[in-house]
Amino acid sequence: MSLNNITFCVSQDLDVPLKVKIKSLEGHKPLLKPSQKILNPELMLIGSNVFPSSDLIVSLQVFDKERNRNLTLPIYTPYIPFRNSRTWDYWLTLPIRIKQLTFSSHLRIILWEYNGSKQIPFFNLETSIFNLKDCTLKRGFESLKFRYDVIDHCEVVTDNKDQENLNKYFQGEFTRLPWLDEITISKLRKQRENRTWPQGTFVLNLEFPMLELPVVFIEREIMNTQMNIPTLKNNPGLSTDLREPNRNDPQIKISLGDKYHSTLKFYDPDQPNNDPIEEKYRRLERASKNANLDKQVKPDIKKRDYLNKIINYPPGTKLTAHEKGSIWKYRYYLMNNKKALTKLLQSTNLREESERVEVLELMDSWAEIDIDDALELLGSTFKNLSVRSYAVNRLKKASDKELELYLLQLVEAVCFENLSTFSDKSNSEFTIVDAVSSQKLSGDSMLLSTSHANQKLLKSISSESETSGTESLPIVISPLAEFLIRRALVNPRLGSFFYWYLKSESEDKPYLDQILSSFWSRLDKKSRNILNDQVRLINVLRECCETIKRLKDTTAKKMELLVHLLETKVRPLVKVRPIALPLDPDVLICDVCPETSKVFKSSLSPLKITFKTTLNQPYHLMFKVGDDLRQDQLVVQIISLMNELLKNENVDLKLTPYKILATGPQEGAIEFIPNDTLASILSKYHGILGYLKLHYPDENATLGVQGWVLDNFVKSCAGYCVITYILGVGDRHLDNLLVTPDGHFFHADFGYILGQDPKPFPPLMKLPPQIIEAFGGAESSNYDKFRSYCFVAYSILRRNAGLILNLFELMKTSNIPDIRIDPNGAILRVRERFNLNMSEEDATVHFQNLINDSVNALLPIVIDHLHNLAQYWRT
């Protein structure tokens, strides 16, 4: 049997510098019109606005895309004056050898033009140095196409047969006939020079060296860890600044200051980098030969206290090099401490083979971590697939009720598991689903278990997904997504929330759309019918809301239209068969009550709709179109979680976490609980006690209200004071502080959170004097109970701060407005409210002072009066 021989060389054997030829730039952008030259004469200083073949300079730089670090300094083409075309034909030799390249090495190409005497970027491009499909070094010609008006985006021209044939000819794949080759090559080159592109489209032509043999990338593994200690020159742990190089940046910034203080500042480009000496010491210290010695090491009392201090740091705290070294040194001693695992992973460089292998083995023997630590491992910081799979395995032990509390954040965490983001390539945990059959099949028969045989397919998906459409490619389901899908298939309630969370977030996140398709394809007929009914209900409610909003008439006319729409559109739908409400899938509705439904006076015309359940109970909800409810949904979910945490400690503060579900980016439903605003209560009853007396009077009680009602009021006030303080809820006024007839106090409208507030000098806690008056005054026993409830609630929530902070950490990349403004700052503000650096006694004193300041504050009272005055003039 004959074998095909393939001759090639490996990149590690090539001790020659990398060369790239900048050939030419085709295309031109629209020039300035005469009117533009008159109105904006400064634009004429930019050459490309005036001349079709304006002067350009090209810079090349090699960078490692996976590790986010530069490998060389940029080098530039010389100045060449152009006439009719932009042609350089100039070889650039980069200061790096081929054997030093990594597989993720890319070329950063920047075209520079002149704005007067100053150089400015014309366009930024990048291209890989190795072919992603076969791991070979690029050879021959390559063309990069880009549009001038699409920033930082380019693509390799793959449909150019002439260029492909030229490459094959120079690589020796065609039989050479000198008399014919000369004619053919000159004709092919002339065709390439005469090709035209649409205005605004450019093509940069490059040429890589035409080596005789293909060069295959191979990374050799050195077994002796101590011999593999990098120097400053090739240290892969050093991070560099990835900003675009600007040749006009000053290297020294000088400020004169005054005669007493010097403010001379030097720019140090190495300041953010790791210290090479410390890096070298770290690698020596963690060499595999020391592992056996570390197993016997135990800390003394002082060191043990130091380790406990590190372990108790809140999530997201960055450890110093010394702290990381201490955790690593005593890793075997800490194996029984479940809280120490996340700190160990922070202290480990998972890109180092020896460290990664050892830590992953340790994880299997580590004490089982809590759910809050598992959630931390699913954040954007931990990209190693094995670590994330470990966290998913821990989540598998959580109950459906627990999973529902964290489901919103887990859906966001799925976005971190895009295949291309992982630092390791052992993607054996992924599930591959056929995208075509997923539209037709259901059940598990269409799943393909990933093994070594299809890892090649997995890699091709990640490399080809950028150039080819994802519609015909297989869907890659990460371990977390697969876990959520399987749990959602088993539990219809969980499945309903999972569907709507994906639906509301998938508009700008294509990966979530793939997960939604996979989930839908595996639903059985009954579950699919349930969700189909919910979708039809939401579509009808949206149509009703938009129809009423378009009606420019009185509220009475809108009410008539609402009654008509409910009777003709909603009632026929819910009468066919009971529908599980998306807000609460356990509630089945079978009819609608138009007589108790209404349209609110607002520019968005939200609808309050009353449904009749199969238990013959009314269910009120509000449906809005044109408002993003995802922030309110997050806040209510966190309030529900905090309520469960308090109840787990046998502390029931009578909270009212009404349900909110965003069914899209600009629409959603809200559970409507019968209530009155504090502004309305004070206007009608001149006090909260008068309102409570009307519904539940008791002549024998001191304040004239039944004891359990007043108990509800005191407890719920304490709970919401603590929670809104921690979440930094802003824009608090008497119109979004609500009270139910049985004394439950709660907040509504969470448009401003995490310290954001439209008013100046907002209070840290909203505690109106009317509430203290309803307690019986600041000297009453109810006020003392209120304070004690606050202290207990604050203490319990501080003990669970890690869980809450991890949930916010998972929402960093979400579209929540007040998180999107400053994701890191938002989490920092929540952490500050917990005051985790304080002892239990100091935290209680802090909250006592907070209550005192809120009770005695005058500015919030003035702002409330101004708000009431503004509301009066609006109505």
From Swiss-Prot:
Autophosphorylated. Might also be phosphorylated by VPS15. Residues 747-768 are annotated as: Activation loop. Residues 728-736 are annotated as: Catalytic loop. Changing D731A: Loss of kinase activity and no vacuolar carboxypeptidase Y (PCR1) sorting to the vacuole. Phosphatidylinositol 3-kinase activity is directly dependent on VPS15 protein kinase activity. Residues 14-188 form the C2 PI3K-type domain. It catalyses: a 1,2-diacyl-sn-glycero-3-phospho-(1D-myo-inositol) + ATP = a 1,2-diacyl-sn-glycero-3-phospho-(1D-myo-inositol-3-phosphate) + ADP + H(+). Residues 593-859 form the PI3K/PI4K catalytic domain. It holds the Pfam family PI3Ka. Gene3D superfamilies: C2 domain, Phosphatidylinositol 3-/4-kinase, catalytic domain, Phosphatidylinositol 3-kinase Catalytic Subunit, Chain A, domain 4, Phosphatidylinositol 3-kinase, accessory domain (PIK). GO terms for molecular function: 1-phosphatidylinositol-3-kinase activity; ATP binding; protein kinase activity. Residues 599-605 are annotated as: G-loop. Residues 293-526 form the PIK helical domain. Keywords: ATP-binding, Autophagy, Endosome, Golgi apparatus, Kinase, Membrane, Nucleotide-binding, Phosphoprotein, Protein transport, Transferase, Transport. It is a peripheral membrane protein. One of its GO terms (biological process) is autophagy. The keyword Zinc does not apply. Disruption phenotype: Abnormal localization of the peripheral membrane protein PIB2 to the vacuolar membrane. Decreases activation of TORC1 in response to glutamine. Present with 1080 molecules/cell in log phase SD medium. Phosphatidylinositol 3-kinase required for cytoplasm to vacuole transport (Cvt) and autophagy as a part of the autophagy-specific VPS34 PI3-kinase complex I. This complex is essential to recruit the ATG8-phosphatidylinositol conjugate and the ATG12-ATG5 conjugate to the pre-autophagosomal structure. Also involved in endosome-to-Golgi retrograde transport as part of the VPS34 PI3-kinase complex II. This is Phosphatidylinositol 3-kinase VPS34. It comes from Saccharomyces cerevisiae (strain ATCC 204508 / S288c).
